[in-house]
A protein has these predicted regions:
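Catalytic cores of nucleophile-dependent amide-cleaving enzymes
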Residues: 137-146, 222-327
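Caspase-like cysteine protease fold
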Residues: 134-148, 247, 256-274, 333-409
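Post-nucleotide-binding-loop coupling segment downstream of the phosphate-binding loop, primarily
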Residues: 412-529, 577
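Alpha-helical sensor/transducer elements of the RecA-like P-loop NTPase core
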Residues: 309, 417, 446-450, 474-484, ...
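Extended alpha-helical scaffolding segments used for macromolecular assembly and cargo binding
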Residues: 761-840
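Non-catalytic, solvent-exposed interaction/assembly segments
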Residues: 1-135, 157
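A domain-level signal for caspase-like cysteine endopeptidase catalytic cores
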Residues: 150-253, 281
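C-terminal boundary/linker of central alpha/beta nucleotide-binding cores
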Residues: 448-453, 502, 513, 554, ...
Length: 840
């Protein structure tokens, strides 16, 4: 605790400074008349700088921002003069209290006036010390004048810092992003997760809030409310010093997603009854006019017994929130007082001031955004001291995950989609089977995987979360075996198929799990008229299985390019569109960073280009790398020439716009790359340059001759690596490591079109037949290698499984039963070795 405390007490139309050292009696300076130091324009400028400037930092905006930053010191000196130079005694108190350094002094502003409490006191600036006080003080808080300190809380758990996170977004797409605070919060405490327990309230309704707290009284140290606040002047039960009735309210979210307005007094009573000492409150973009919305909520909570309320005086950027929340919760988990933890979080924001913008990362002075309301200093959590040297096993212990069968995350990670995750969660509240429909390349798989990781991190599903791709025609047997092996291990294979399915159904109906069935459209044939991947009997099995799961505790998420009405299971349909504007900017920033383009050097037309690409992730990936050699205006003109030729329904235009983006990117590749890359249309999910070389390099064997007949020349491994790396640099492929490259699901469709345009159908068909034989030989060779070199052979067969399955389908269509048999034998053997034999 700091040795010195300076208290600024406001009452009526005057303020008075008090100084207390340690436990000695407080001393006071003469009271002086309080005059509001800021006009409305100054407060409006401050809000614009903190909330709006970085949204569009072009034109005169940077100059205006610089001028406002320069005013920070002037505004801070005005506050300092008002408080610490109003009398000789006040001047003396400040000098004495800070003689040992600002770190030995805490500052408290006491008032019952929202107008005073809402002032940016954090801007206090000492001319003699030439620094702002807030970042260096031991602590800075606001408190109420006429409310006594409540009795001590009873003991709370000390094994973990328990946090209940309430994320309310009742205004849908117009609301701020779902994970604006939650994502940086989770990331920032990832290194101390063994000390922190975070649970997200689902649904974020007040009824569920009451149930959760009453079910766990004396358990939560902190309730973190991430949502909207307001002030209701007609609410009864609270009087301001100016005599106006009313009180603050928070907006929860009803089960149907509509707003649920709850008075602060009602919330505070629940916190008090269930012994929750700390409330963390995030401001939202709706509170822009400067009304006393959040101060009214914070003061109400403190007046009714909360030990501390941490709030954001302005909307906070995710990057700043990450730094602040990480340090705040890290300090609290280590046993700090709330005021010292807030001070540490403020310093973290000050030291890491770069914030993302469309024009590159820019510094922002937003360390004044967090504020603390409390009646006294309080320590919510005191961890058990452990002086023992940690055992090496503590560091080698594997991370436990509920995710099963998930693909590797893409190079840019999961970005945005907050509103879509919100839509999915709401849909699952009403129906446990949801179909997510969207065009190729729009990001259905990424969203499904992002939802799964979000649910795992926030305890949204207590059971396992399973991912299964149907791109190569998975069956119900695959689904049953995946779940069974994960839940019951090798024991599962001892039971008959009927018993296995019965057990899986019972498990899924009674456990809070999630099944993700990805790329489902080929199951019944896609595009329309194509032969289904699964026969009628297998499709009926999937249909019955889904019907049996209806109404159970597990959720099923199906992704497809179209509606799957044949399932006839009463699923909820959601359509997926492009990314939102801010998410587009974030993804674009990562793409440009990868290719070495500095956004600071791009003109404002860059934002017009992003808008033209319609938030389509794959289009962004293939177009933006060209900014390395071209200006945004040139790209816009070229793309518009292609788009002007499009007509049809909006969905058709969007799908064709992807082709336009790919056309543009393809046109910029070398002639050799444009000629040979369409060969990848015959591959699925990923491709190995080594096998491309083995098939296409030798002009003296049948494979090489077939390749040369279509593409005009034979290619060696070095040639393929150059072409694949060129495509990866253009965003068309993704390099996974060594000689393996990832193929986006939308790419084979596009490459197949180019292949058909450039070559006769008979030529392509002959090439496919040669590739089928090639993969059959590969499968047979590595099946034999399983005896002498099992590890290497298993690795090759599992990596090539998508391509083997694709060629297995081709063998079935062409009735090439010899090739089908050897591919099946190889996959069956490797699946047997890894416990997946029942799938075959």
């Amino acid at each position: 605790m700091a040795r010195n405390c300076l208290r600024i007490n406001h009452e009526g139309d005057s303020i008075q400074l008090f100084w207390q050292r340690g436990q000695s009696n407080p001393r006071h300076a003469p009271s002086v008349t309080f005059t509001h130091p800021f006009d409305k324009q100054a407060l409006a400028d401050l809000r614009w700088y903190l909330e709006e400037y970085l949204r569009f930092p072009y034109g005169i905006a940077p100059d205006n921002a610089a001028k406002i930053e320069q005013k920070f010191q002037d505004w801070g000196e005005q506050l300092f003069e008002l408080v610490f130079r109003s009398s000789e005694k006040a001047r003396e108190f400040f000098q004495t209290a800070t003689f040992d350094g600002l770190r030995e002094c805490e500052l408290v502003i006491t008032s019952d006036s929202p107008e005073v409490l809402n002032l940016p006191w954090e801007l206090l600036y000492s001319p003699s010390d030439r620094q702002f006080l807030a970042p260096s003080l031991a602590g800075m808080s606001r408190s109420l004048s006429d409310y006594a300190v409540r009795a001590e809380m009873s003991n709370l758990p000390q094994d973990k810092l328990n946090i209940l996170l309430v994320i309310a977004r009742p205004y849908g797409e117009k609301d701020i992003a779902l994970k604006t605070i939650a994502r940086p919060l989770l990331e920032s405490v990832s290194h101390i997760r063994q000390k922190v327990n975070i649970k997200v309230l689902r649904p974020p309704s007040f009824e569920q809030f009451e149930r959760e707290l009453n079910a766990h009284p004396g358990f939560y140290h902190i309730v973190h409310f991430d949502g909207h606040g307001d002030f209701d002047p007609n609410s009864v039960g609270f009087q301001h010093t100016l005599g106006a009735a009313g009180q603050g309210v928070l907006v929860f979210e009803a089960d149907d997603g509509s707003p649920q307005i709850i008075p602060a007094a009602q919330i505070a009573q629940n916190l008090a009854d269930c012994r929750v000492p700390i409330f963390v409150l995030n401001a939202c973009k709706s509170a822009q006019e400067g009304e006393e919305k959040f101060s009214s909520v914070a003061t109400r909570l403190v007046s009714l017994g909360a030990k501390g309320v941490v709030a954001m005086a302005y909307s906070v950027y995710a990057e700043a929130a990450k730094h602040f929340m990480g340090r705040l919760y890290g300090e609290l988990a280590a046993g700090a007082t709330v005021d010292s933890a807030v001070a540490a979080g403020r310093r973290e924001i000050l030291n890491k001031r770069l914030r993302p913008s469309p024009n590159g990362d820019k510094p922002l002075q937003d360390w004044l955004v967090p504020v603390l309301y409390q009646q006294e200093s309080y320590t919510p959590f005191i961890p058990a001291s452990d002086t023992d040297v940690l055992d090496i096993d503590d560091f080698l212990e594997p991370t436990v995950s509920n995710l099963v069968g998930f693909p590797q995350e893409g190079r840019y990670g999961f970005i945005g989609r907050d509103y879509d995750i919100l839509r999915l969660e709401r849909a699952f509240r009403q129906n446990n089977i949801v179909l997510l429909q969207g065009m190729a390349g729009v990001g259905k798989t990424e969203l499904a995987c992002g939802l799964a990781r979000w649910l795992e991190e926030t305890q949204g599903r207590t059971g396992k979360i399973f991912f299964m791709s149907f791109e190569q025609g998975a069956t119900l047997s695959n689904v049953v075996n995946q779940v069974g092996r994960e839940v019951w291990g090798d024991k599962f294979s001892q039971y008959r198929a009927e018993q296995q399915q019965q057990a899986i159904l019972k498990y899924l109906k009674t456990q809070s799990s999630l099944l993700i069935w990805d790329n489902f459209e080929p199951v019944a044939g896609f595009p329309a008229g194509n032969e289904p991947l699964l026969n009628g009997s297998e499709r009926d099995n999937l249909q019955r299985f889904l019907k049996d799961l209806r109404g159970g505790k597990s959720w099923v998420l199906i992704t497809s390019r179209r509606e799957e009405s044949w399932l006839d299971c009463g699923y909820r349909l959601l359509e997926l569109r492009g990314l939102r504007e801010q998410d587009v900017e974030e993804l674009a920033a990562k793409i440009l960073e990868t290719v070495g383009v500095d956004r600071k050097n791009l003109p404002s037309e860059y934002l017009e280009l992003l808008k033209l690409l319609g938030g389509h992730p794959f289009s962004l990936r293939v177009v933006l790398p060209h900014l390395k050699t071209q200006q945004p205006k040139q790209l816009i003109e070229s793309l518009r020439q292609g788009l002007d030729t499009l007509d049809g329904t909006p969905d058709k235009v969007r799908e064709k716009s992807l082709a336009v983006s790919l056309d543009y990117s393809f046109a910029k590749l070398s002639e050799r790359a444009r000629r040979h890359l369409p060969f990848l249309a015959l591959f699925s999910e990923q491709v190995d340059a080594g096998w491309l070389h083995a098939f296409s390099s030798n002009p003296d064997d049948e494979d090489g001759q077939a390749y040369q007949a279509v593409f005009g020349e034979n290619l060696q491994k070095a040639d393929w690596l150059r072409l694949l790396n060129e495509a990866a640099a253009a965003g068309i492929l993704e390099h996974l490591g060594e000689t393996i490259y990832k193929i986006h699901p939308a790419l084979p469709w596009y490459l197949r079109q180019r292949l058909s345009e450039q070559h006769a159908a008979q030529e392509v068909s002959e090439l496919e037949k040669k590739l089928l034989v090639f993969y059959a030989v590969l499968a047979d060779n590595y099946r034999k290698e399983l005896i002498s070199n099992a590890e290497m052979a298993s690795f090759v067969l599992r990596v090539e499984e998508p391509n083997l399955l694709q060629n297995l389908r081709l063998a079935e269509q062409q009735q090439s039963w010899a090739e089908a048999q050897v591919i099946l034998q190889a996959l069956g053997e490797v699946h047997k070795r890894i416990g997946r034999k029942p799938e075959f």
